[in-house]
Amino acid sequence: MKLVDTSSWVEYLRGRESEAGDRVEVLVLSGEAAWCDMTLVELWHGVRGVKEKRELAEMESEIERVPVNEAVWRLASKLALRCREKGVTVPTSDIVIAACGAAHKLELEHCDGHFDDILPLAKAL
């Protein structure tokens, strides 16, 4: 299973010709795609039109949901501090998603450059 970040989900859901969208399609078809509640919040926040709403609602019952539990929040807090100490400025939502992946020992599928800065710090915790 692989935790898919919002950036890659958007590529897939909007049908863009991209490597990230192709990777997500493979994960979805193989049953290996997962998301967390933070990703869902971001997706619902950016959904456009009736078609996207319908697709996302249908997918919610099909895609594995990785819990954002107490361990994730504790790790996210540590990761936020580590980012601050290293001068890395990234959205809080990306910190939570990275912490979710790290806490559950899942690789993260993304096409968001913020994770190139966050993930090495998460692995060091």
Q: What positions do the PLM features span?
A:
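Short secondary-structure transition/capping segments
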Residues: 48, 78, 120-123
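Active-site neighborhoods of divalent-metal-dependent phosphate/nucleic-acid chemistry enzymes
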Residues: 19, 64-111
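Short, hinge-like loop/turn segments at secondary-structure boundaries
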Residues: 50-54, 83-84, 124-125
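Structured helix-beta-strand junction loops
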Residues: 30-31, 59-62, 86, 104, ...
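Acidic, PIN/NYN-like endoribonuclease modules and their adjacent C-terminal/linker elements
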Residues: 1, 98-125
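Short, well-structured N-terminal submotif of metal-dependent ribonuclease cores
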Residues: 1-35, 44-58
